[in-house]
Each structure stands twice: as C-alpha cells, then as structure tokens.
Amino acid sequence: MNKYNLKGYHDWNPAVEEYYDWYAKGRYPNNEEGRAHYLGQVHYMDKEIGLLLDLLEEQGLRENTLIFFISDNGGSTPIYANNKPLRGSKYLLYEGGIRVQMLVSYPKKYEKGKVYQNMVSAMDILPSICKEANIKIPDYIDGMDLTPLLKGVNDSLKHDVLVWDTGHELAVRKGPWKLRKSFNDSEAKYEMVELELGNFITNLNTDIGEKINLIKKEPVILGDLEKEYSVWKSKLEKGDNKK
C-alpha cells in the first residue's frame, strides 16, 4: 500500500474475536442465528457492490464497463446457504454445488433484463473479455466467447458438453442428461450433507433435484456420457508430476 501512497490499516487484525466466535458456532446445524447471519452477509455484499456501481456512475464509466458477477460454487450448508430446489452444496457435483448464477452487465452493448438458460461456464469469462477488449483469444483457452449470446446475435450459443472432475467425484453434462460418479464422501461429511456413492444418470429437465437414478434404464446415455468424459480427459495436458 505504501508503494501506491495508500493509507494503511495499522490496527487491522484478522483474528477478530467476534468473527472467530461466530465461525465456531457457524458449523453447528441448529444455530438459531445462522440463516439470519448468512442473509445479513449477502445484504452487506449487495450494498458494497452498489457502492462500486455508484462510483462507476459518478466517474462516467458505467455505460462502457463490462461487469461479470458469478459465484465459484453453490452455497455451503454449514454457513446456512440454501440451494433448493437443487440438491447438494459446495464441494459436491450435485447441481447445488456447480449450478450458479452469472450476471453480466454492459449497458453500452448488452440489452438489460434478458434471461438465458444456456449452459455456459466461468471458463467463458476470459475469452468474452478478450473479445470486447479486442485482444486475441489464446488458442489454448477452454472457454468460449459469449458476446454473440450477450448481444442477441446468437441466442442458442452454449456448451454442448461440460465436464467436472474433483478426484472425489466426476460429472458430465450434455443437454438435459447428467452423469455423476461419486467415489468418496469426505467432502460431503465436511458440508454436513448426504452424498450417494456410485454411478448416477439424471434427466435434469424432469428431475432438477437429482432424486431418480436412471442408470439402468438409460445404458445408451451412460455410454455416451462416459465416452465424452474419456475424450475430455484424453485432451488434458499433464504437468511436471505426471501421474
């Protein structure tokens, strides 16, 4: 901060007793103040984002500023998030752990108030920013440029397939179909939620809560999604620790 002549916060202490007292209680499932505390944090965040937008407005920059707002994962059960009607939470590959909102604002170029259900990803943010900034999108980027969708040029733009692999679980999404394979429930225990181990096929158009396993009824779908996973994995580049 000194480098940029900014005033330092010399009395700042990350080990604030109030915060740690709360965190100690936060992981208890029956804390009466839990949900209220969570909603208070969300309200505070919303207020702070509003201050940033107000500043952009005051500086005359709001119309020509591209803003993405997205969560990196679904809400966490121990801190009283609620992902219903989606099943699961942070760390897990149920929809409650991986399906999140993405809000995009660019008043100068994008129409306000439009809602899309297209399957997109956080990977798409970088190539979209590159496109708007007239920067060449690197060939090795996995994401795609969303600007044709956001400008209303191509309303059907979406990923045909998305794949996740955490080591504990893997998931493949293709259209309404989803394959989830779960091998280890340690993350679920941390999140205080139930995780069914095994292999599962779900039609998300009819079962957004992932309650019905269609794996025995849909062997062709299973084979197709397993093939998509194999293709995806074969394209991964191995690092120095080649295992």
Q: Over which residues does each language-model region extend?
A:
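Active-site-proximal cap/lid insertion segments
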Residues: 1-126, 130-141, 182-199, 204-211, ...
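Loop/turn elements at helix/coil->beta-strand transitions in domains of secreted/extracellular proteins
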Residues: 61-67, 157-159, 174-177
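N-terminal sensory regulatory modules of PAS/LOV and PAS-like folds
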Residues: 67, 146, 163
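Short Gly/Pro-enriched turn/cap motifs at secondary-structure boundaries
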Residues: 90-95, 161-163, 169-170
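Glycine/proline-rich active-site loop of Rossmann-fold NAD(P)-dependent oxidoreductases
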Residues: 136-137, 155-158
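Bilobed periplasmic-binding protein-like "clamshell/Venus-flytrap" ligand-binding domains
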Residues: 157-158, 230-243
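Short, surface-exposed beta-strand/loop micro-motifs that present aromatic residues
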Residues: 168-174, 178-181, 188-192
